[in-house]
């Protein structure tokens, strides 16, 4: 084994180790930020508090993120990804494409009962990062809705139509309804009412 080969291997290992450390620190910062954003809210959470919770320096925070807004975006993105899992699972359990779509919408509203998600996604996001950024980061959820509408139309369960307008209409309705639930004095009652009303809208679109 030549010294050049050993040096190349050592450099590769060093790069991988550095990448792993970077990923670990980034993940720790996002975890800490999520905890504090959910508990204290975006406005009341400082980067110094996030650094202390993650057991790193404030300089380390700025090494990985430009500022609090970008850190919130990372937390928000993770919440959207986490939220998508039960939605996809609920969708996949139904054979009928429109029943699957309705199950996915129900799962979305069920997930919105989580108090941490409510604080981060429903209550603070618009103030923290703005409407356009929220919609951009929620793009995967909208794309899932468009696909579900397209599949239901192809199966003859709803009338043929361009999927994008209806997806935006229904997603907007789900988000507004979820915010009503999040602000309700009795969230369980509000959630049941939301499920009922969304169900009526979706049933009205179905072709028997």
What are these regions (language model features)?
Residues 81-85, 129-155, 164-168, 192, ...:
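Amphipathic alpha-helical packing segments from all-alpha helical-bundle domains
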Residues 62-65, 69:
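A short His-aromatic
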Residues 1-40, 44-56, 69-73:
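Basic, helix-initiating cap at the start of DNA-binding domains
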């Amino acid at each position: 084994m030549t010294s050049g080969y050993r040096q190349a291997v050592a450099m590769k290992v060093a790069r991988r180790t550095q990448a792993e450390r970077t990923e670990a620190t980034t993940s720790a910062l996002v975890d800490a930020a999520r905890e504090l954003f959910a508990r204290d809210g975006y406005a009341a959470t400082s980067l110094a508090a996030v650094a202390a919770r993650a057991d790193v320096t404030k300089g380390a925070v700025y090494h990985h993120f430009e500022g609090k807004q970008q850190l919130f975006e990372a937390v928000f993105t993770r919440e959207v990804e986490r939220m998508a899992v039960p939605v996809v699972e609920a969708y996949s359990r139904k054979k009928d494409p429109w029943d699957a779509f309705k199950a996915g919408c129900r799962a979305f509203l069920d997930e919105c009962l989580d108090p941490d998600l409510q604080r981060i996604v429903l209550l603070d996001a618009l103030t923290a990062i703005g409407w356009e950024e929220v919609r951009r980061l929620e793009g995967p959820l909208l794309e899932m809705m468009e696909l579900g509408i397209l599949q239901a139309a192809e199966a003859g369960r709803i009338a043929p139509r361009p999927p994008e307008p209806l997806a935006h209409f229904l997603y907007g309705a789900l988000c507004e309804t979820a915010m009503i639930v999040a602000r309700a004095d009795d969230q369980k009652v509000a959630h049941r009412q939301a499920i009922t009303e969304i169900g009526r809208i979706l049933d009205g679109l179905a072709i028997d």
